Amino acid sequence: MTQAAGGTGFPVPGTGRVTVAVPAPGPGQGRWVGAPSAAADPDGGFVVAYRVRITDQRGAATVVARSADGEGLTTVATLDKGRFGAMSMERPAVVRTPEGRWRLYVCCATPESKHWWIDVLEADEPEGLADAEATTVFGGDEHTGVKDPVIRVADGLWRAWICCHPLDEADEEDRMTTAYAISQDGLDWAWQGTSLAGRPGTWDARGARVTAVLPDGRASYDGRATKEENFSERTGLARLAGPDGALVAEGDGPVADVRYLDVVPLPSGGYRLWYEAPLADGSHELRTELID
């Protein structure tokens, strides 16, 4: 059961014109495309990065695409997990720097482990990310896996919301919270503590993963109540509660049965949304939505 966005005015999936941007890579459980991140391109279009998952390969690759309208995507770079020595890949973050270059933050799974880390690549244009050098910026440690970054830069400050998975209990690594970090350059980061965590006894008790933060502090996150709901998270809303990056959940339940929502505000005042949506056969597709 989902709830309306109430008076927050947050652009909620299912309230605009929906288009399938990238179909599922095949029918059935584990064949997923999604976990998108998007940024506005100076030419009026968008750059979108997303993960492709195939059952026997898990997160097989991160794809970078250009789009003139947000709906039709043209692939300009594909980064295979093998390039990073990763067992899997998950949600990337694509960012245009204040200097006009492009960065791609990719999250990678350590083989034979539940650990994750995050690398960054940089190039003059999105096409150049295919061959750019990778540098680790969030390494995690033996106690924590880090993944699914949400990164924003404004007024000379880089801000990151990072999904953290504790590794202290075997078979319980799906638990998740979101931590907050800041940086002057987007490369050297200082952790600021927990930004958002699940609430005991509620729909997000098992974990809370921030997925989008708007310039005015409105935000969205993925949540779930149980271990069994892993990979079937739903979207909830939150808001910034202060200058330290802390977020407070809004409402008593989810607002959409999708996950990995990203939102780009448009010059016209509307929003372009991208998110990962489940299908009845267990596959997932990447959808986009225009909200005027």
Where are the regions that the model predicts?
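Carbohydrate-active catalytic/glycan-binding domains of CAZyme proteins
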Residues: 1-292
